[in-house]
């Protein structure tokens, strides 16, 4: 019988005693003797009690209570279960989670349901003059709640007039937005205006171009694309195909240098700022798509993950759940095309009524100066952000700031400790989750290095499993009955989260094949259904989760998910490469994995490092660019004609192990140069910058 089963049986026995009118103090005394005094002291006291029974027999309770005390001693483990250390916080968190869930359901059950854009209108009435958004940088500006709501209303009326009502309804198509971070406030005004009309919005990575950009727009089902004028070249590369599919394109500016593309600026300025009636979005349900955020998933090009209005409100309430208030100032250096930057950051501040400070890009040298300038109290991060801050040489004013809380994901334990030692006792709440996932984890006790915490209470609300997996196929291992095999405590396992009515998995827009690939059936019993996160975690005895690795083709580098198939598609365009296999490799001292490609040269061709460098710099964002190239005579495949990546990833880029020619990305020389032992040593020691 397990510890928790014993404790449950003991609790039922004690409840029976209460029902029979018997005292519980003997059982409580037994518990105190065993757990708080230890076994030696416990048995000494019991021996003394036995010797002194003639003197204490007059107040010995009924034999049932004595039996309960004996049962308590026999069932109790020698020490309290580790989980009980955090029992008070587990109970408080579970009640808080239940309260927020019931409140969310109440809001969504209204007719029409209360949507995330309603928070803007509420803040515009309650706190009209409070600053909602601040954009830092050379073109720094700010906007109040009243002004932001007025601009959103102008955008709604302008787009309604431009596009006609049939074009902007939820069941007819989305609107895609492609903007640089410097245009954040303008883009957010348009985004909120579209939300007032009930139109879902797809946020596209502004680094996308060519085929990935075209695929992103098409897969979202967008009938409209709004583009930053500074991304003119990106748009014009794919414009003919967009126009051929009747996708209307607009520049978020006052002029258009491109035939076939209109400018929105004048229409936005001329539109009225009258309130937008809620009836225009009356057809929206809480399960309706609100936002599409692109994710690499485990395979293929970026896919638009569906964030319903329910999910957006859940995520945007995280700051409130963490105890933040309208008096907080949140510093956000994360991109708006990520759920952390847009939903938890911007929309989270709108829900709170707090001020969100948007930095166009992360700068370790300016980070704390801007935090001081804007009196920031909360910072959002991915693990790399805090590591970069710790890598900057120490300054006397490192602890002179008003930041008291940090929220994010991907923070290593060593960086966590270093960050708090250097910059002060900043409370850190680490999160775990994926954009398309149906369940998230939260380290609500601030335990260093953990990505989340669970308990028996949380498991009832959010069932999940850690199961054994095949590292080659990246699939769960099954037992003889066909069910998944749970891992032991402390062992790494593939995280699966149960799909239920109140925790649905909406998947991706478009083909259902991509969505079905993320589903795992018959995990614990016949007929159940789980979401495969593709992540490997470990669970310790106290209920803390620790991130171990990512499965499948996707790896994480510099805070971004990198799809190997997307990179393979870009590299395969080169005429001197016949076959390409991209994978992630570990680099000492670095978080995540950096890209590496094993390639087979086309017959009669030679490797051209300069041409490859120019190609990847033109077609791939920096985080997706492979840093190492390995030339092989042939690429190994499985029986099902899939490229073998695991062995290559294990071998990495070690020049002492690999006999094949190896090359490394050299940004100074703008080429891929031969990887020599001295350069390999520099990479391992951290003196060669990746």
Curated annotation (Swiss-Prot):
Residue ranges, Cytoplasmic side: 1-30, 77-690
Residue stretches spanning the membrane: 31-51, 56-76
PANTHER family: LONG-CHAIN FATTY ACID TRANSPORT PROTEIN, LONG-CHAIN FATTY ACID TRANSPORT PROTEIN 5
SUPFAM superfamilies linked to this entry: Acetyl-CoA synthetase-like
Regulation of its function: Inhibited by mono-unsaturated fatty acids, palmitoleic acid and oleic acid and nonionic detergents, triton X-100 and polyethylene glycol hexadecyl ether (Brij 58).
Reaction catalysis annotation: a fatty acid(in) = a fatty acid(out); cholate + ATP + CoA = choloyl-CoA + AMP + diphosphate; (25R)-3alpha,7alpha,12alpha-trihydroxy-5beta-cholestan-26-oate + ATP + CoA = (25R)-3alpha,7alpha,12alpha-trihydroxy-5beta-cholestan-26-oyl-CoA + AMP + diphosphate; chenodeoxycholate + ATP + CoA = chenodeoxycholoyl-CoA + AMP + diphosphate
Gene Ontology biological process terms, A to Z: bile acid biosynthetic process; bile acid metabolic process; establishment of localization in cell; fatty acid transport; ketone body biosynthetic process; long-chain fatty acid import across plasma membrane; long-chain fatty acid import into cell; long-chain fatty acid metabolic process
Subcellular location(s) per record: Endoplasmic reticulum membrane; Microsome; Cell membrane
E.C. no: 6.2.1.7, 6.2.1.3, 6.2.1.-
Record's protein name: Long-chain fatty acid transport protein 5
InterPro entries per the UniProt record, alphabetical: AMP-bd_C, AMP-bd_C_sf, AMP-binding_CS, AMP-dep_synth/lig_dom, ANL_N_sf
Organism superkingdom: Eukaryota
Entry-linked Pfam families: AMP-binding, AMP-binding_C
Membrane topology: Multi-pass membrane protein
Tissue occurrence: Predominantly expressed in liver (at protein level).
Gene3D superfamilies in alphabetical order: 3.30.300.30, N-terminal domain of ligase-like
Molecular function GO terms recorded: ATP binding; cholate-CoA ligase activity; fatty acid transmembrane transporter activity; long-chain fatty acid transmembrane transporter activity; long-chain fatty acid-CoA ligase activity; protein-containing complex binding; very long-chain fatty acid-CoA ligase activity
Keyword terms: ATP-binding, Cell membrane, Endoplasmic reticulum, Fatty acid metabolism, Ligase, Lipid metabolism, Lipid transport, Membrane, Microsome, Nucleotide-binding, Transmembrane, Transmembrane helix, Transport
Function statement: Mediates the import of long-chain fatty acids (LCFA) by facilitating their transport across cell membranes. Also catalyzes the ATP-dependent formation of fatty acyl-CoA using LCFA and very-long-chain fatty acids (VLCFA) as substrates. Mainly functions as a bile acyl-CoA synthetase catalyzing the activation of bile acids via formation of bile acid CoA thioesters which is necessary for their subsequent conjugation with glycine or taurine. In particular, catalyzes the activation of the primary bile acid, chenodeoxycholic acid.
GO CC terms, sorted: basal plasma membrane; endoplasmic reticulum; endoplasmic reticulum membrane; plasma membrane; protein-containing complex
Residues binding AMP, per UniProt: 292-303
Family: Belongs to the ATP-dependent AMP-binding enzyme family.
EC top class, as a word: ligase
């Amino acid at each position: 019988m397990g510890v928790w089963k014993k404790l449950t049986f003991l609790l039922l026995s004690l409840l029976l005693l209460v029902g029979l009118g018997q005292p519980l103090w003997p059982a409580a005394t037994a518990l105190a003797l065993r757990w708080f005094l230890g076994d030696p002291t416990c048995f000494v006291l019991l021996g003394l009690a036995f010797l002194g029974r003639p003197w204490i027999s007059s107040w010995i309770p009924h034999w049932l209570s004595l039996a309960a005390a004996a049962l308590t001693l026999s069932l109790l483990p020698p020490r309290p279960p580790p989980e009980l250390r955090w029992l008070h916080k587990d109970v408080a968190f579970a009640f808080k989670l239940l309260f927020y869930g019931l409140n969310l359901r109440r809001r969504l059950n209204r007719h029409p349901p209360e949507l995330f854009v309603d928070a803007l209108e509420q803040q515009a009435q309650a706190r009209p003059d409070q600053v909602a958004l601040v954009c830092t940088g050379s073109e720094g500006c700010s906007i109040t709640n009243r002004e932001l709501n007025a601009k959103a209303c102008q955008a709604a009326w302008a787009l309604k007039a431009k596009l006609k009502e049939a074009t902007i309804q939820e069941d007819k198509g989305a609107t895609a937005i492609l903007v640089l971070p410097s245009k954040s406030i303008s883009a957010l005004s348009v985004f909120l205006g579209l939300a007032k009309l009930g139109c879902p919005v797809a946020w596209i990575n502004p680094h996308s171009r060519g085929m990935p950009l075209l695929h992103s727009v098409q897969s979202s089902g967008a009938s409209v694309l709004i583009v930053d004028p500074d991304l003119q070249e990106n748009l014009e590369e794919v414009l003919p195909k967009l126009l051929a599919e009747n996708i209307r394109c607009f520049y978020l500016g006052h002029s258009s240098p491109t035939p076939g593309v209109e400018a929105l600026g004048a229409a936005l300025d001329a539109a009225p700022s009258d309130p937008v009636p809620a009836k225009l979005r009356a057809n929206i349900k809480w399960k309706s798509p609100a936002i599409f955020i692109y994710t690499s998933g485990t395979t293929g090009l970026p896919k638009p993950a569906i964030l319903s209005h329910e999910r957006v409100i859940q995520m945007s309430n995280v700051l409130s759940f963490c105890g933040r208030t309208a008096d907080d100032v949140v510093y956000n250096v994360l991109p708006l095309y990520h759920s952390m930057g847009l939903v938890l950051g911007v929309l989270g501040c709108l829900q709170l009524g707090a001020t969100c400070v948007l930095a166009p890009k992360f700068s370790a040298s300016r980070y704390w100066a801007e935090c001081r300038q804007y009196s920031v109290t909360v910072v959002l991060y991915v693990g790399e952000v805090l590591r970069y801050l710790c890598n900057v040489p120490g300054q006397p004013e490192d602890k002179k700031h008003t930041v008291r809380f940090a929220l994010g994901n991907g923070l290593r334990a060593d960086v966590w400790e270093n960050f708090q030692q250097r910059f002060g006792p900043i409370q850190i709440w680490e999160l775990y989750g994926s954009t398309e996932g149906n369940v998230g984890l939260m380290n609500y006790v601030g335990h260093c290095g953990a990505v989340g915490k669970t308990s028996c209470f949380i498991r009832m609300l959010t069932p999940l499993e850690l199961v054994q997996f095949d590292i080659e196929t990246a699939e769960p291992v099954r037992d003889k009955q066909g069910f998944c095999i749970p891992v032991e405590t402390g062992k790494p396992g593939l995280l699966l989260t149960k799909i239920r009515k109140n925790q649905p998995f909406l998947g991706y827009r478009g083909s259902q094949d991509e969505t079905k690939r993320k589903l795992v059936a018959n995990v614990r019993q016949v007929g159940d259904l789980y979401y495969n996160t593709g992540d490997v975690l470990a669970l310790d005895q106290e209920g803390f989760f620790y991130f171990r690795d990512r499965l499948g083709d996707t790896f994480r580098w510099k805070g971004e998910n990198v799809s190997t198939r997307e990179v393979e598609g870009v590299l395969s365009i080169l005429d001197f490469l016949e076959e390409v296999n991209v994978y992630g490799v570990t680099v000492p001292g670095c978080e995540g994995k950096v890209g590496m490609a094993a390639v087979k040269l086309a017959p009669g061709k030679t490797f051209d490092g300069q041409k490859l460098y120019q190609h990847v710099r033109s077609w791939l964002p920096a985080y997706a660019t492979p840093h190492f190239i390995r030339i092989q005579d042939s690429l190994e495949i499985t029986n099902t004609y899939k490229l073998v990546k695991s062995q290559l990833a294990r071998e990495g880029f070690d020049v002492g192990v690999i006999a094949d020619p190896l090359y490394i990305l050299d940004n100074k020389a703008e080429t891929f140069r031969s990887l020599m032992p001295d350069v390999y040593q520099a990479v391992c020691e951290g003196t060669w910058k990746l």
